[in-house]
Amino acid sequence: MYIVAISLLSHTIWIQGVFFLFGLALGVISAFKIFTKTLAQKNEVIRNLEHDKAILQMSLDARRNQEQLIEEFSHKLTSVSQAFARDIKTESQEFFSEKTQAIHSVLAPMHNTLSVFKQNLENFETKQAEDRGALREQLSQLLTAEKKLERETQALTNILKHPGSRGRWGEIQLERILEISGMLKYCDYSVQTVDANDSSSRADIVIRLPQNRSLVIDAKTPFSEEYLTDSHADPTDLVKKIKDHIKTLKTKSYWDKFDQSPEFVILFLPGESLFNDAIRCAPELMDYAGQSNVILSSPVTLMALLKTVTYVWKQENLQNQIREIGQLGKDLYQRMHKLFDHFHKVGKHLGQAVHSYNDMSSSLSARVLPILRTFDKLEISSSHNKIEGLSQISTLPHSPKVPCQEPPLSECFSHQDTSSSDPLS
């Protein structure tokens, strides 16, 4: 039983062993399959990982290349930026320097102009202040002068109320105009001249004219006290007094009592207002005076007439100088003619002297000089200087010639019209 049991046990153990081995084999097979599958999966995973690794490596390489490119680009960008910044800075500095210079060149004249304008403005303000001060001073002086003039006018009005004072005032005005015209008392004119044949004919002023002629001027102050004090006075009385005085001058006939005097006399009215009022009241007054050989004259017209007389005197003096120059020209021509005669005589004698010198030189050279040179050959002379021959003079004096056939100077002046014409004709 025991053996059977052992056999059964052995058989059981063997079966169990077989089953164990079979199970183990199945397990090994399963495990191998699982391992194989797992290995395949692992290999797949490894391949995937290697692929991913390759991709990652490529990405990493690309990234590294990108980083390197970025770094290189960054360096290049930095260098380019720095160079660009330097160029921009240089160009901007040059640009701003040029623009600054241009602005300075534009603003410099403006600055100078503004400086000059400021200086001129300051000078103008200073001068304006000085002018205002001077103007105030002049206004003060003007007021003082106006007051003084008012007093003197009143005094003159009081003086001119008397007929004798009015006449003297007219004569003084006439003499002042003569002085302003450049005439000298007792030289160009005389005062209160009396005719030698008629002591009652006393002319206020007698103007000297060329060729011993005379021009008579009579001063008249024909206004009344009413005309002097009243600005609205009727000038009819003034015209009446002027006409009465014209009749008096016509009666005196000064042009017959002074030698070579023009056939008229000048009636001087010592005021433009007198002349204008008289002509305005009586326009025919000038014709009325002309018919009586009287010429009415105001201060302005008389001054123009005196300037004409001065011009006539200048022309007379010019003609006298021309006559004197003509006489001097004649004398100079005669003296130069005599001087040229002396020149001709001197030239003639010089020519004769040259011919005589040449004849003597020829005679000495032909007759005396050969003998003297013989003495030189005999060594008799103690001097070592040899006698030189005499040279001929070939240049003869030339007589002065007249450059052109002009008429003699005396004839030029002889044709000059030295006759003096009448300055008032």
From Swiss-Prot:
Biased composition, class Polar residues, residue ranges: 413-425
Gene Ontology biological-process entries: DNA recombination
Domain of life per record: Bacteria
Pfam family, any one: RmuC
UniProt-listed InterPro entries: DNA_recombination_RmuC
Coiled coil start-end: 37-66, 127-162
Keyword Coiled coil: yes
Disulfide bonds, paired cysteine numbers: none
Keywords: Coiled coil, DNA recombination
Family: Belongs to the RmuC family.
Function: Involved in DNA recombination.
Identification of the protein by name: DNA recombination protein RmuC homolog
The organism of origin for this protein: Chlamydia muridarum (strain MoPn / Nigg)
Lineage: Bacteria, Pseudomonadati, Chlamydiota, Chlamydiia, Chlamydiales
Gene name of this polypeptide: rmuC
